């Protein structure tokens, strides 16, 4: 029997619907971030840097890019015979088989995988947060308190606390109450979605939860309240570093912009805590004499002939002469043609912005199609789409994946409008 002290179960099956067109064809953890990474790289790198060498990645929604990205885990030193990284998708069994119904059910369906390593502890992680954390220190805290469960928490502003699961604790950190998105929170200690459980205890509760017909099979809504109700030893591990849930267009854009601030809140260049990812086979970036670059991240394989200010260019982005990019994210292998102007926009992979096109101008009007998603003044262009020359695109505009010139009924797309491939929303 292979014995591991602690293994990780990384939840990476979420759609991330609040990211709109960015997650239409890809799971949220596989969305590009920070000039060369995908969001899941941060949790995987935390595991590597914390000495965790066995990780089960639980996938479900649109897993193709995520699976290809992780591969056999080599960038994270997880291409191992004993342990390493394993992709765990829903599958049919002789007696049953179904989609993961919730976070707890996803882990329950993989009890056999966990039992294979007979761990003392299991850490449950979300694959869609941006942060750097040493899980070994959290494990030490768990052991010192003889805990059944330890939940990592972070202080959030009071006005934002109702968006999170809130832990109410004694002064020593022992949890006495958990509130899921309370209207009137009693504290500001928000769950980060990072849990360490003593495996024998968690295993028992997963089985009980699966047998409960009215459970939604969720850690926050079912497992944690059940353990608290039974008087289990549960502790809050307070984290004080950078942590972002990039689950909305605004949060995603702001977190990327944090990387190019004068003094970045989140340091990607820390040699003591590297963020690992598969490296693209591309040459060094090229900055032409006609270019002007200020406060920006320029990845491998980029060619810059225009102006780039306070922006992020992913590998293979091509910025032609006269083009101006400001406060924007240009993802891999996209091209911005001559004299185009882009402001406060997210341009997905392999998109083309035509000559003299202008994006991100006009009044800040919420999107008519999905006002709760595109409402922060940021225009989003889907992958493999093409913006025609001379087009003027307003704020909070959504350009669908694969949209082209034939899908534009007008070259003037006003703020809050959308352009769909084929002209019709799916």
Swiss-Prot record:
Annotated pathway: Glycan biosynthesis; glycogen biosynthesis
Gene3D superfamilies: Hexapeptide repeat proteins, Spore Coat Polysaccharide Biosynthesis Protein SpsA, Chain A
Transmembrane domains' residue ranges: none
InterPro entries cross-referenced by the UniProt entry: ADP-Glc_PPase (IPR011831), ADP_Glu_pyroP_CS (IPR005836), GlgC_bac (IPR023049), GlmU/GlgC-like_hexapep (IPR056818), NTP_transferase_dom (IPR005835), Nucleotide-diphossugar_trans (IPR029044), Trimer_LpxA-like_sf (IPR011004)
E.C. no: 2.7.7.27
Binding site for alpha-D-glucose 1-phosphate: 165, 180-181, 191
Keywords annotated in UniProt: ATP-binding, Carbohydrate metabolism, Glycogen biosynthesis, Glycogen metabolism, Nucleotide-binding, Nucleotidyltransferase, Transferase
Entry keyword annotation includes Nucleotidyltransferase: yes
Any one GO molecular function term: glucose-1-phosphate adenylyltransferase activity
Domain of life of the source: Bacteria
Catalysis performed (reactions): alpha-D-glucose 1-phosphate + ATP + H(+) = ADP-alpha-D-glucose + diphosphate
PROSITE patterns for this protein: ADP_GLC_PYROPHOSPH_1 (PS00808), ADP_GLC_PYROPHOSPH_2 (PS00809), ADP_GLC_PYROPHOSPH_3 (PS00810)
GO biological process annotation, one example: glycogen biosynthetic process
Enzyme class of the recorded protein, top EC level: transferase
A Pfam family that the UniProt record links to this protein: NTP_transferase
Biological function: Involved in the biosynthesis of ADP-glucose, a building block required for the elongation reactions to produce glycogen. Catalyzes the reaction between ATP and alpha-D-glucose 1-phosphate (G1P) to produce pyrophosphate and ADP-Glc.
Subunit structure: Homotetramer.
Family per similarity comment: Belongs to the bacterial/plant glucose-1-phosphate adenylyltransferase family.
UniProt-recorded name of the protein: Glucose-1-phosphate adenylyltransferase
